Amino acid sequence: MKIEEVKVYNFRSHEETVVRFRKGINLIIGQNGSGKSSLLDAILVGLYWSKKLRLRGLKKDEFRRIGGKGGTRIEIKFENDDSKYVLFRDFSRNVAYLKVQENGKWRHASEPSMESVSSYIERILPYNVFLNAIYIRQGQIDAILESDETRDKVVREILNLDKLESAYENLKRIKTNINLLIESKKSFIARTENIEELIKANEDELTKKLSEINEISSKLPPIRGELEKVRENVKELESIKGKISELKIQVEKLKGRKKGLEEKIVQIERSIEEKKAKISELEEIVKDIPKLQEKEKEYRKLKGFRDEYESKLRRLEKELSKWESELKAIEEVIKEGEKKKERAEEIREKLSEIEKRLEELKPYVEELEDAKQVQKQIERLKARLKGLSPGEVIEKLESLEKERTEIEEAIKEITTRIGQMEQEKNERMKAIEELRKAKGKCPVCGRELTEEHKKELMERYTLEIKKIEEELKRTTEEERKLRVNLRKLEIKLREFSVMRDIAEQIKELESKLKGFNLEELEQKEREFEGLNEEFNKLKGELLGLERDLKRIKALEGRRKLIEEKVRKAKEELENLHRQLRELGFESVEELNLRIQELEEFHDKYVEAKKSESELRELKNKLEKEKTELDQAFEMLADVENEIEEKEAKLKDLESKFNEEEYEEKRERLVKLEREVSSLTARLEELKKSVEQIKATLRKLKEEKEEREKAKLEIKKLEKALSKVEDLRKKIKDYKTLAKEQALNRISEIASEIFSEFTDGKYSNVIVRAEENKTKLFVVYEGKEVPLTFLSGGERIALGLAFRLALSMYLVGRIDLLILDEPTPFLDEERRRKLLDIMERHLRRISQVIMVSHDEELKDAADYVIRLRLEGGKSKVEVVS
């Protein structure tokens, strides 16, 4: 991968930054707080932003630029495997895409989403490889020395060993599946051992069943023939018996019907006599109707007029009352409208004045909002200082650096003492060995060597060795504690180094805050809020007045409409009174008296008309009953004739039916049906059994074939199993060999770089693979020593050497290295060495991007980009 261009918008101190990178060593240089590391973080976020980064505690709010217009956006152009890519992320809209150029045209390389883009980049360059071998972050140079397991994970990903391990495990599963198949087939062969016997037994049973089927099939036809004859005889006798029963029922029904007709005739004759008497009575009442008709006509006319008159009168009086009240209310509202019109004009003038003043105050309110944002940022940054002031942070950092120097000097002094003690111990042990071998003269003092003198010297040297070992143990423990303290101190140093950057940001923001006149701005804001509240209140009142004035205007038309309705109602009322007078009445009371006089005649007329209607109805019913009586007599004669015919037929049928013969035939029919049913059921049972036996035979023969196939397949599976086991062994051996060769190469590169850093003090870096661990050792004076032997500065140098070795190993596959401030924890001599290493080693990597505030590194760079902070914004300047 080679990064060609990075565009950053509203990311931390970067408002709009465009940086182009070239092949070779690219150096981004600038003072602390100028946005150098932020640019590298933008590359990390741009490439890998996903749940993984969010779970590590990185949030959008932490890198979104305060006061920035528009959202945070990152665009990265890079090249990989001779293909050009453009990656874009917009964090405010949660939009992302990755495009690749093919044949001069751009197409989407993945789904356009945050997670899909990150997944695609992960396939090109895994996140853990990028973070541990490609991108060496500020203060994290020696972090890879902390855990053997983490280091092993990085090495596995760099070497693609995970794929081999996956293949190894997949083959293990295949081996298990093959074994299961072999066991399954062996089990099947064991289960089907007596297959030939089962086939023979089923074939014998089939022959037996087929013989019985033939026997039953020959018996059935004659029995079925006799059954059909008997069934016909029984059917004929049952038909006669049924007809006899049916005729008996019909005769009984006809007799019942005859009785009913006789009773009906008696009832009709009685009803006819009663109706004749009632008709005579009603004819006497009806004869007075002509006399009453004139009075009834007058009554109806007057009563109809009165009802209509009273209804219209009530309606008109009610409407007049309602319209006159509404007219009065409208006139009052119209009078009030003039006052509201004047108030509306007064409010409009006041709103214009307030609006003008609000526009004047708006810039002050916006400026105060910016100031508040700066205050919030200062508070958030101060919270990260854990209660310390910026000055206290600088003071604490200086104190920690001083303490680190003291501990390193103490470790150096102790290391020298340990070396001296080990030398003294070795000298004493060498003297004891020489004394054991010596004869004649003493190798120590030159005197004659007696056994007593020899014993005395050896005891003295042994005692001295014991004292040296005790002192060595105490001193080694003291050194271990100092190194533990040094590691803790370096963690604090990294923490306070970050806090120092935060403190500088706070100073910059506080300086910016001083540029705001907060007291004046807050006063303007209070005035703005008060005027805004008054403006909204007046605006609401004006809207209410305007609605009222619109309603008043509409009421003018309503008033004219109501006045017209009142006029028409009064005309209609006068017309109603005129109609009353035309009938000859001066008042409604006179009309009611006449209606009361006519009511007696009306009641008599109504009663007579009811009787007239009843008379007509009775005469109609009388005629109907006479007709009904004639019909009943005719029906009675028909029923008597039908009874006589049915009884004759019944007598004839009874002479043809013999009950004893019928019962004998029925018993024979049941017996034959049972016999046929039994034989048929047995035949069906035998046929089903034959089909089952045939199916069983087919299955058994298939199993026999499968059994033979299973024997052949077992042989094939056993051969395949042998091949799988052989392949697993080869993968395991290759993985071990590949890892060993790679670690040897990484060890060679790291040894060369680390030896240069330490002026040859440490001759080698040993990288050794163990189960799920990759361990590191250094060689000092020909002996392997653990990393606890190193001073703090030497650990930084080793961390840098190992990371550079990983990057150098990746040359040709991933030609990219990113270094963020590699020099802060290196002394002057090691910084000088780093320049030499850059010239001799980093030149092999196609592209190196390095961030530093150290001007010395410019000499080793091919392309220098300078960042500076102006007005809280990062600015880019290409130096060379």
Swiss-Prot record:
Binds 1 zinc ion per homodimer. It holds the Pfam family Rad50_zn_hook. Residues 225-336, 391-744 form a coiled coil. Its cofactor is Zn(2+). SMART domains: AAA. GO terms for biological process: double-strand break repair. GO terms for molecular function: ATP binding; ATP hydrolysis activity; zinc ion binding. Zn(2+) binds at residues 442, 445. Keywords: ATP-binding, Coiled coil, DNA damage, DNA repair, Hydrolase, Metal-binding, Nucleotide-binding, Zinc. Part of the Rad50/Mre11 complex, which is involved in the early steps of DNA double-strand break (DSB) repair. The complex may facilitate opening of the processed DNA ends to aid in the recruitment of HerA and NurA. Rad50 controls the balance between DNA end bridging and DNA resection via ATP-dependent structural rearrangements of the Rad50/Mre11 complex. Homodimer. Forms a heterotetramer composed of two Mre11 subunits and two Rad50 subunits. The two conserved Cys that bind zinc constitute the zinc-hook, which separates the large intramolecular coiled coil regions. The 2 Cys residues coordinate one molecule of zinc with the help of the 2 Cys residues of the zinc-hook of another Rad50 molecule, thereby forming a V-shaped homodimer. Belongs to the SMC family. RAD50 subfamily. This is DNA double-strand break repair Rad50 ATPase.
